Every structure is written in C-alpha cells, then in structure tokens.
C-alpha cells in the first residue's frame, strides 16, 4: 500500500494596512499551483485565489503572482487591508509535494507626530 504525504511548511507573516506583502511559495516542479484563502484556521469556507497558476478574476486588482523566477509562485498582495488577514495555502496543482501555509496578520498604520519639541536646559551653579 502506498501512502502519499505532503511536506507542510508553515510561515507567519505580518503586514501593515496599505503595504505590499509577499507570501512565499516555491516548488521544484514546473506544475502550476493553487492558492486558497481561509479567514481563520477553523473557517468552513475557502476562497480560491489562484487556480492552475492563474489569479481568479475577482482578485486580479490587488493580487499578483511573482513568476519571474522558475519555481517561484509567491503571492503578492498590494494595498493590504485588515480583511486580508487569515491563512493562505499554496499547493501544487497535482496535489502532491509541498504545501505552504502562510498565516497573515495585518496591523493598522501607526501615525507619528512630527511636532515633537525637545528642550535642553543647562543648569549652572
């Protein structure tokens, strides 16, 4: 009896609202990958973002694949929103091999005031 198991690589990523974030996915094969998204690990519904190496039309505005290097199918999310937080899974289209799981956390922007004044006093006796 043959049992196939996939290697699972789990990565945590953090991004700030409005930034661009890259979620890594590498495969030694030239087989296209599927990317799916779950809002949480216990979610009952998954959204397909990419099927057979093509971004699904609903997501093409902000999501791209980094396919400039053979084997690199990293997902790039532009203008990250809080709604993008969740679990992203990349796996080879044939269903064997490595599965990449990326847990994305999104933080709000931090604003820093530029009107800070520092005064130094010299005390002499």
Listing of model-derived features with the role each one plays in the protein:
Residues 27-62:
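N-terminal V-set
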Residues 14, 114-120:
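Short, solvent-exposed loop/edge segments of extracellular or virion-exposed proteins
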Residues 59, 71, 98:
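Exposed loop/turn and edge beta-strand positions of beta-sandwich/beta-sheet ligand-binding modules
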Residues 32, 83, 87-110:
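Extracellular/luminal immunoglobulin-like beta-sandwich modules
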Residues 25, 35-36, 50, 75, ...:
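Disulfide-bonded cysteines in secreted/extracellular proteins and peptides
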Residues 59-66, 75:
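A broadly used, surface-exposed interaction patch
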Residues 1-13:
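N-terminal Sec-dependent signal peptide, specifically the hydrophobic helical h-region
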Residues 15-24, 68-72, 78-90, 123-124:
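Solvent-exposed loop/turn motifs of extracellular immunoglobulin-like beta-sandwich domains
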């Amino acid at each position: 009896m043959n049992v196939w198991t996939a290697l699972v690589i789990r990565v945590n990523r953090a991004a700030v609202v409005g930034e661009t974030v890259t979620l890594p996915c590498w495969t030694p094969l030239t087989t296209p990958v599927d990317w799916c998204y779950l809002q949480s690990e216990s979610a009952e519904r998954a959204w397909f973002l990419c099927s057979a190496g093509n971004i699904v039309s609903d997501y093409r505005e902000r999501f791209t694949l980094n396919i400039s290097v053979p084997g690199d199918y990293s997902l790039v999310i532009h203008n990250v929103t809080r709604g993008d937080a969740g679990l992203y899974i990349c796996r080879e289209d044939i269903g064997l091999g490595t599965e990449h799981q990326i847990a994305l956390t999104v933080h709000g922007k931090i604003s820093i005031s530029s009107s800070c004044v520092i005064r130094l006093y010299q005390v002499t006796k």
